[in-house]
Amino acid sequence: MAVRSLWACRLRVQRLLAWSAAWESKGWPLPFSTATQRTAGEDCRSEDPPDELGPPLAERALRVKAVKLEKEVQDLTVRYQRAVADCENIRRRTQRCVEDAKIFGIQSFCKDLVEVADILEKTTECISEESEPEDQKLTLEKVFRGLLLLEAKLKSVFAKHGLEKLTPIGDKYDPHEHELICHVPAGVGVQPGTVALVRQDGYKLHGRTIRLARVEVAVESQRRL
């Protein structure tokens, strides 16, 4: 049995040697030879350079991206600075307009009042301490006409600028428009709780009360204060 096994091993060795000789005769390296291992090693090393070239390529890509981002940041910074400057200019113009509105907001009203002042000045010129007694009647007539003209002009100016006079006789008492001075007994035809007498007219500007009318309000006799 041992002889048979030895003979089989010898046969296999002979076949392997014959196969190796035939492989080398054709110039092919043996699969397990040193040359084959060296060639395989070189092939493996030949794949290493891309790994060595990898970092520089990635670094260049990052640099390009960084430059691009830096330009974008600079562009955004310039835009932001311009926007801030525009906002500041708008704020200054708005503030200037508000200040001008405060100063010149009543310019038109004052211009119309100047005409009233002219009428008043001409009316006072009609009065003279040295006027003769026979001229006093004529002077009073001129003053009266001047005062009527002055009143008409004032009403026209007030209406033009939305200023409305409040004379609320007979109206129901409203604390938002009337200032109560006292209560008076309700007379004939006068309803309790209504304005019986106006001591001082009130005024509204474009529907907003700027001065309350000073009034006396009617009440029933037993509730008189």
UniProtKB/Swiss-Prot annotation:
Transit peptide: 1-32
Alphabetical keyword list: Acetylation, Chaperone, Mitochondrion, Transit peptide
BP term (GO), one: protein folding
Gene Ontology cellular component terms for the protein in this record: PAM complex, Tim23 associated import motor
InterPro entries membership: GrpE, GrpE_coiled_coil, GrpE_head
Cross-referenced Pfam families: GrpE (PF01025)
Location (main, coarse): mitochondrion
N6-acetyllysine modified-residue sites: K142
Disulfide bonds: none
Domain of life: Eukaryota
Annotated compartments: Mitochondrion matrix
One of the record's GO molecular function terms: protein homodimerization activity
Family in the record: Belongs to the GrpE family.
UniProt subunit comment: Probable component of the PAM complex at least composed of a mitochondrial HSP70 protein, GRPEL1 or GRPEL2, TIMM44, TIMM16/PAM16 and TIMM14/DNAJC19.
Function: Essential component of the PAM complex, a complex required for the translocation of transit peptide-containing proteins from the inner membrane into the mitochondrial matrix in an ATP-dependent manner. Seems to control the nucleotide-dependent binding of mitochondrial HSP70 to substrate proteins. Stimulates ATPase activity of mt-HSP70. May also serve to modulate the interconversion of oligomeric (inactive) and monomeric (active) forms of mt-HSP70.
Protein name: GrpE protein homolog 2, mitochondrial
Species per Swiss-Prot/TrEMBL record: Pongo abelii (Sumatran orangutan)
